[in-house]
Amino acid sequence: MRKTTGMEAAWRTLLLTVLLFVAAFGTHEVMHLLVLYAVGGHGSIVVRPWRMGLFDADIYALHVQPDQPVGLDRQLLVNFLGPALAAVPLGALLFYAREPVVRVALWANVAILAFYAIIEAGDLILESAYEIDLSILTTPEFNYGVPALMMLTAIFVAWRQNTEVHVATG
């Protein structure tokens, strides 16, 4: 079997990371809904327009819409546990995956879900407890830009792992 080149590893990582992101993002929203029901709330998953902050345009996003407010503590659980629970199957796969490209793509998506867990819970805490509105946390540019940077980092890592020169000593 021939060794994968850096460019091949980069393309494979890009493809796998994006495919995993789509699945992880959908799972993340389903987990929000599951936790919402588990804490006694009701709601649904909707596709809604999301206004961009830097451009005069909307993009569309999946979102869990509660039928009624569930209170701060329960909403905090919903916000944090949605992405955290979505990361569990990826973490299990990461434990068993041996191929470097697969591991890098899984790590990137676990990191992305951790990012979502932190900003979704953090934004709620900042607004509710401290009355601090960091509106950047809720912009599409931030919510998709940071994960895009994480994906680019994964691609660079995969490329770098396959282009390093190993010098024998001894």
Model-predicted regions and their roles:
Residues 1-13:
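Start-transfer (signal-anchor) and selected internal transmembrane alpha helices
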Residues 2-3, 161-170:
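Short, charged juxtamembrane terminal tails flanking transmembrane helices
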Residues 5, 40-42, 169:
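Feature targets compositionally biased, intrinsically disordered low-complexity regions
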Residues 10-24:
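Membrane-embedded alpha-helical segments that form the functional core of polytopic membrane enzymes
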Residues 20-71:
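Small-residue-rich helix-interface/hinge motifs
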Residues 56-165:
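Metalloprotease/metallohydrolase-associated module, dominated by Zn2+-dependent proteases
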